[in-house]
Curated annotation (Swiss-Prot):
This is Rhythmically expressed gene 2 protein. SUPFAM superfamilies: HAD-like. Disulfide bonds: none annotated. It comes from Drosophila melanogaster (Fruit fly). Induction: Maximally expressed at predawn or early morning. It comes from the Eukaryota. GO terms for cellular component: mitochondrion; nucleolus; nucleus.
C-alpha cells in the first residue's frame, strides 16, 4: 500500500468497478415483467435493453439531465423500460407502466440486483485501515442517477467512502473534466493538486484517459488484454496500470509492484 500513500484523493467508478449486476438486466427484467403479466424471452430483453440503453444515452444524455427541456431521471428510465419491453413483444399498458417501472427503479437501489466486484470490499477495507482519513479521502465518481448514495448504503460500501458524486446531480458526465473537478472540491482537501489524485475505473475513455488528461493518475480495471486496449484506445494506456480486477490491483499494490 506504500505506493498509494502519495495520494490525497482516491476515487472509484461504480458499475463493473466496485459493484456489478447479480444477474443480467435481461433476466431481472424478465422476472419482474412476469409478475406484471409481461412475459417475453430474456435473451430478447437483454438485446433490447442494450439497444435502448445506447439509444437513450444518445438522445437524452445523462439520464435526461442534459436535454432541453430537461427530463427527470425517473422518466428517462420509464422510457427505456417501455421501449425494452415493447421491442421484446410485450408492451406495457400505460396504466401499468408507472407502477411497473417504479418497481424496477426501486429494486435497482438494492443488493437484490447488485453485488461487490471481485476484491472491491477487501481493497476498500485495506485503504480505510492504512490511509488516515484526514490525509486521504475516498470517493466515487459515477455516471449515475441520484439513486447512487442509497445503492452504496444498501450494499454497505458507503462505510468506506467519504463522498459519492453522480453525474445527474452535478450536470456533468465523465469524461467531462467538470465531474472530476467537483470531486476535488467535494473532498474538502486544501490545495489539492491533480497529481495527488488517483481514479480507478473500467472505462478506458470515461475513466482512465479522462483522469489522465486532467493530470490525475489512473488505473484501468478491464478484462480485455493490454494489446486489445492499446489497439482500440491508443498508446496512452500504460501496461502497468491495467488490472483484470480490483483483487489483482490490491495484490500488486500490496506486493509493491505498481509504480506511479
Amino acid at each position: 500500500m506504500r505506493s498509494l500513500s502519495r495520494f490525497r484523493l482516491i476515487t472509484f467508478d461504480v458499475t463493473n468497478t466496485l459493484l456489478q449486476f447479480r444477474t443480467t438486466p435481461g433476466k431481472q427484467y424478465g422476472e419482474i415483467g412476469a409478475l406484471f403479466g409481461a412475459r417475453c424471452d430474456n435473451n430478447e430483453l437483454a438485446k433490447n435493453f442494450k439497444a435502448n440503453w445506447y439509444k437513450m444515452n444518445r438522445d437524452y444524455p445523462n439520464f435526461g439531465r442534459d436535454t432541453n427541456p430537461q427530463m427527470e431521471w425517473q422518466q428517462w428510465w420509464r422510457k427505456l423500460i417501455a421501449g425494452t419491453f415493447a421491442e421484446s413483444g410485450a408492451a406495457i399498458p400505460d396504466e401499468k407502466l408507472h407502477n411497473f417501472s417504479n418497481h424496477l427503479i426501486e429494486l435497482y437501489k438494492t443488493s437484490i440486483c447488485w453485488q461487490p466486484c471481485n476484491g472491491s470490499v477487501e481493497l476498500l477495507q485495506q485503504l480505510r485501515k492504512e490511509l488516515k482519513p484526514e490525509k486521504c479521502k475516498l470517493g466515487v465518481i459515477a455516471n449515475f442517477d441520484p439513486r447512487l448514495p442509497t445503492l452504496l448504503q444498501n450494499t454497505k460500501l458507503d462505510q468506506y467512502l467519504d463522498f459519492a458524486i453522480n453525474s445527474y446531480e452535478v450536470q456533468a458526465e465523465k469524461p467531462d473534466p467538470q465531474i472530476f473537478q467537483k470531486a476535488m472540491e467535494k473532498s474538502g482537501l486544501k490545495n489539492l493538486k491533480p497529481e495527488e489524485c488517483l481514479h480507478i475505473g473500467d472505462g478506458p475513455t470515461t475513466d482512465y484517459l479522462a483522469a489522465k488528461e486532467l493530470g490525475w493518475h489512473s488505473a484501468l480495471v478491464h478484462e480485455k488484454s493490454y494489446a486489445y486496449l492499446v489497439k482500440k484506445y491508443g498508446e496512452d494506456i500504460d501496461r502497468d496500470h491495467v488490472f483484470p480486477s480490483l483483487y489483482d490491483f490490491h495484490k500488486k499494490i500490496s506486493d509493491g509492484a505498481v509504480v506511479w
